[in-house]
Structures are given as C-alpha cells and as structure tokens.
C-alpha cells in the first residue's frame, strides 16, 4: 500500500467503453480510487453496487469514483450493464497501475496461496495527494465509509 501524503502515481487506462482516462484528468476533484479483484464476484459486486447507489452523494461532494481491476474492457462493460453501475471502471489487464499502487500481493484463500489484487481503496485530494488508504476493506462497508471520509 502506498503511503499517505505522497503524490498519487499518474496513469492512463481504458474504461468500460474503451475511452482512455488519466488520473491527472481529475485534478481539482477528490478521487476515490478503488482496486478490486474481479468483476461479477460477490464481494466486488456488493462494493460496486454500493458505490453506484451512493454516486449522487459522492458527486455532490465533488468526488469521482474510479474502480480498477485486471479485467478486460469487455468484462467491465458487461459488469456495468448487468448492475447499472453509474461510475467509471478502468481495465488494467497488464497490472501496471495495480503494481504501481502496491495492491498485487500474495493472498491466502481457503489454504491456497496465490498472487492477486488485494481489495484496497485510496482517497486522493484535489492536488493529487493520497490522503487516505485502506487495505483492510470490507466490500459492503467501503462505499459508506468513503462517503464519511468526504464529510
């Protein structure tokens, strides 16, 4: 996990429609940048739907939500359409941003050890500085917790 108080690494990734986004495009806004393991899985779906349901509240507070996983653009599009997600999903199939943000880690699941994305959420301020980082994310609680951070 990256340290608080540092400049968030800039990046450029395609969204669910294939449109390229840079973190620097969002200068002047707060950014909730959350990394999740996989589209259409139970925890990831809860988290995404929670952010989507609260999306108007985030925009009222001047924040944007960017969800990142190693899934493809096409997978993100299906995920967005299936659940009517109201925010941007970014495809990092080469894991460049996932690794830059230090969320590609060894994970243990039911005794099996493998490498994967550790669910992590960063709050980045209007100047691009990381002001909050959480790698102990509970998928269902993350959207509400991040909304409280903006209060």
Label every PLM stretch briefly.
Residues 1-151:
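Chalcogenol-based redox active-site neighborhoods
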């Amino acid at each position: 996990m990256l340290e608080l108080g540092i400049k968030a690494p800039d990046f450029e990734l395609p969204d669910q429609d294939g449109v390229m986004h840079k973190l620097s495009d969002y200068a002047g806004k707060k950014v909730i940048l959350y990394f999740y393991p996989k589209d259409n899985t139970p925890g990831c779906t809860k988290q995404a739907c929670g952010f989507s349901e609260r999306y108007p509240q985030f925009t009222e507070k001047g924040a944007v939500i960017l969800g990142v996983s190693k899934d493809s653009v096409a997978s993100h599009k299906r995920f967005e359409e299936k659940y009517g997600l109201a925010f941007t999903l970014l495809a990092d199939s080469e894991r460049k941003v996932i690794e830059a943000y230090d969320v590609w880690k060894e994970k243990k699941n039911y005794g099996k050890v493998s490498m994967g994305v550790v669910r992590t959420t960063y709050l980045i301020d209007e100047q691009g500085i990381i002001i909050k980082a959480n790698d102990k994310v509970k998928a269902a609680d993350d959207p509400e917790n991040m909304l409280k951070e903006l209060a």
